[in-house]
Curated annotation (Swiss-Prot):
Keywords: Cytoplasm, Iron, Iron-sulfur, Metal-binding, S-adenosyl-L-methionine, Transferase. This is 2-(3-amino-3-carboxypropyl)histidine synthase subunit 1. Pfam families: Diphthamide_syn. It is found in: Cytoplasm. Its cofactor is [4Fe-4S] cluster. GO terms for cellular component: 2-(3-amino-3-carboxypropyl)histidine synthase complex; cytoplasm. InterPro entries: DPH1/DPH2, DPH1/DPH2_1, DPH1/DPH2_2, DPH1/DPH2_3, DPH1/DPH2_euk_archaea. The gene is DPH1. [4Fe-4S] cluster binds at residues 128, 234, 363.
């Protein structure tokens, strides 16, 4: 490193004086985050490791107040980790809904970490979209991924990664009263949501269990490696309909809730929107899903040439699953054409006129939600194995949504659906 590079510092954007003692990790640790990770991380313990002088930095705390108070961007934790790992160029990646705060966060990190920030503006639909590959190609040595859980383990990424869940404070009292008003005392409710509302789900669980006025059993389901009470649009727990009276999703929109409804069509589903505080009964047309997806599989059975798509949006694609499917498709006598796409659109696939059917290893919801819009069958890995008679057929009572389960297709494995009770 030249003398000029050492002396070059980002322009300061906040008024105040920084202490030299805050510029680096006092322990001088050079542990690489991507090479070693403890099996379980105690969040409270991690917070306690942040130096008190950083937590009490008046200038930093004043800058943090520029961000909405009900959104926890964990700025202290981020600054501490960037300093600890002596990162020089840091990529920050967040969903479009949070990009409005990206420049404020960028300014804060540049000033208090003395590093360069690169804002990644491409779409980030979920945790599967973490784009450490692109960040590394931009010479970044650290990436902060916002608003999604640790779906992609930090010990396999190409650069150091910090996941910030961006937990959101909501009116928990209103949520509790809403559930008490709408469900009989003693009801067994599977409550889940996106990672932003996970603390609220666990907090209300204890309060409702201890309520003498109107006790409810809140059961945050878990499909590993997701956290208890967490659900994704492609991954949710298969629940026992004899043990659960209802499902309640905390969050806006239906995308993630639909995963649980598809996986558990016989359990009533409800949604609590924490932004407008509305509580609604939600339904999903499972019969239509079965008809549309079964039709796509039937059409694909006669295919001779199959386009096998590897999703290249972040880490959506899985090479092991692609290779496994390629082997099986070739063994069935089909010609396989491998295609790499960051995003999959009907117009794009229509250009491959001589391909009879497509199999996409990216996001199963592309096929489930939008498969009808493609002029050729677009199958998921699971549906492809059904077509090849290597997996059980779905029906109106069961369609698996376990893509990122520890043994799921999203992890390069082949799940066993034979032991699922219907």
């Amino acid at each position: 490193m030249t003398m000029g590079e050492v002396e070059k510092k980002p322009r300061r954007r906040f008024v105040g004086i920084k202490k030299a003692a805050e510029e680096s990790d006092p322990s001088g640790s050079t542990t690489e985050l991507v090479k070693k990770i403890k099996p379980k991380t105690n969040i409270r313990h991690a917070i306690n490791q942040i130096p008190p002088e950083l937590l009490n930095d008046e200038e930093l705390n004043a800058a943090i107040k520029l961000l909405p108070s009900n959104y926890n961007f964990e700025i202290h934790k981020t600054v501490w980790n960037i300093r600890k790992h002596k990162a020089k160029r840091v990529a920050i990646q967040m969903p479009e809904g949070l990009l409005i705060y990206s420049l404020v966060i960028s300014d804060i990190l540049e000033q208090f970490c003395q590093c360069e920030i690169v804002v990644m503006g491409d779409v980030s639909y979920g945790a599967c979209c973490i784009d450490d590959y692109t960040a590394r190609s931009l010479d970044c040595d650290f990436i902060v991924h916002y608003a999604h859980s640790c779906l992609v383990p930090i010990d396999i990424t190409t650069i150091k990664v910090l996941y910030i869940f961006v937990t959101i404070n909501i009116d928990e009292t209103h949520l509790i009263k809403t559930l008490q008003k709408n469900f009989p005392r003693g009801s067994r409710i599977a409550a889940f949501g996106t990672i932003q509302f996970n603390p609220t789900i666990h907090s209300m669980k204890d309060k409702l269990l201890q309520s003498e006025e109107h006790m409810l059993y809140i059961i945050p389901p878990q499909i590993k490696p997701l956290s208890k009470g967490e659900v994704l649009g492609c991954t949710s727990e298969r629940l026992n309909k004899e043990q659960i009276d209802a499902m309640v999703y905390v969050g806006d929109g239906r995308f993630h809730l639909e995963s649980a409804m598809i996986h558990n069509p016989e359990i009533p589903a409800f949604r609590y929107d924490p932004y407008n505080r509305r509580f609604t009964r939600e339904r999903y047309d499972q019969k239509q899903l079965v008809e549309v997806r079964a039709s796509a599989i039937d059409k694909a059975r006669s295919s001779k040439k199959v386009g096998l798509i590897l999703g290249a949006l972040g880490r959506q694609g899985n090479l092991a699953t692609v290779e496994n499917l390629e082997t099986k498709l070739k063994a069935s006598g089909r010609t396989v054409v491998k295609i790499i796409l960051s995003e999959i659109f009907p117009q794009k696939l229509a250009m491959f006129d001589d391909i009879d059917a497509f199999v996409q290893v990216a996001c199963p919801r592309l096929s489930i939600d939008w498969g009808y819009a493609f002029n050729k069958p677009l199958l998921t890995p699971y549906e492809t194995n059904v077509m090849l008679e290597n997996d059980r057929m779905f029906n109106e009572k069961y369609y698996p949504m376990d893509y990122y389960h520890i043994n799921g297709y999203g992890r390069g494995k082949v799940p066993n659906h034979d032991d699922v009770t219907i």
